Design a protein with these regions (language model features):
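A glycine-rich (often HGG/GG-containing) alpha/beta subdomain
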Residues: 1-109
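Glycine/serine-rich phosphate-binding loop and adjoining beta1-alpha1 elements at the start
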Residues: 83-146
Length: 147
């Protein structure tokens, strides 16, 4: 079981596409529940801001995990899977953990060093934790990021 991040940001996708994928708290909660019901995924947390949408999961199968996340995002947004794949980035295992640290430090923000993102990640974590969607792996990574 390894951490997997599937996402897009202002650096990889046009704002119009990010807006189509944007999720309010209710949609985020529902999406986390759908994700953790997939056999390949055991934990899920979604960071959704005006500049990024990132799905943090724990998977037992890299390719199946990525495919499951993409299918759920396409279903939620109505955006075709092939279109999504053109803008998504994927990070796995150590690279996923490093990405979370980079994001929470504000190093991947439109304005480098901005601190609003740490609160947004904290909110995403709290929402997912309240729904029982996070477990020991995401919890440990959030702790390492000092969120």
């Amino acid at each position: 079981m390894s951490m997997l991040v599937v996402g897009m940001s202002h650096q990889s996708a046009p704002v119009a596409l990010l807006e189509r994928l944007s999720m309010d708290d209710t949609v985020r909660n529902d999406t986390c529940e759908v994700l953790i019901q997939k056999p390949s995924l055991s934990e899920a947390m979604i960071v959704s801001t005006c500049n990024r949408l990132e799905v943090y999961t724990v998977t037992n199968s890299f390719h199946t995990g990525v495919q499951d996340v993409v299918k759920v995002l396409a279903s939620n947004s109505g955006v075709d899977e092939d279109e999504l794949r053109g803008y998504l980035y994927v990070r796995y295992a150590d690279a996923a953990a490093e990405h979370l640290l980079t994001v929470t430090a504000g190093l991947d923000s439109m304005v480098v060093g901005e601190q609003q993102i740490i609160g947004q990640v904290r909110t995403a974590y709290q929402l997912a934790a309240e729904r029982g969607a996070v477990g020991p792996r995401i919890h440990a990574q959030i702790g390492r990021a000092h969120v």
